[in-house]
């Protein structure tokens, strides 16, 4: 047995007790935290072992078409992580120079619902390549060169209009694998323009949900992750993007368990970052709508008002209202105008609404 297979077995072994505990009183107290742990483990397992889930050959030279079709035959919530893993596996296999992966040939035939996952997976692969080649003590010039190559790699492989979806994951890779270079990489991204700086910190925020100190969802892990999202970036706008990215990750991973999202909502409300939470939640659910256009099962709980004491008023204000508005008044315009990748940057609801219905000829 290889080390990789042994690690997979260890993940599955941990999932057993987590599932059992989560089934006892789902969504309640510590049992909710076991649900959350299982969700994290499952998302990671499906991403990291997508090739095993689909029984792909070990030979890295394969087309994306067949694996994508196999992944789409899976249950939708599982498929999104497998698709991301497929693209990551494809982007890291071998030393070949990839070009036009999703913009020509087979890539043009892949359905819209796969674009979020596939661009994210490719971006993770390209970021890992670029940052992994830096060595142990890179100077600012070499970091800037690596970032420039990474951005170029993303742009020559993206479907038109989807650059942001593959560039944002460099923040995930930087924060999880190279935390000591977090600010130098951020400076290099900023040197290429404010839009890339925003994407970077959104990715950093997503990473904070998965770093070791926050991975096990016990002992106020949401509060710790939020504190990092507020303290690690150096500017207010970067903090908004980091909190939005963190909320995105919490929402997407725990989509079947709204109670987990409700806990994150409460923490964000207490810290006074409601707009960033709303953007992260709405953006994740807009992405989900793109990935699962026919879904009602998972989305429905986020559209249902709560009644009674406790968090009901907060839920209706921070979740039901914005999600209903986004579903009805924002998503159709983003899809029609090919701007779905804009959900990777913090924007207010008004800015999203405006962006959704701008002419394609206007700059973003």
What are the roles of these predicted feature ranges?
Residues 1-364:
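Mature, well-folded catalytic/scaffold domains that follow N-terminal targeting or propeptide regions
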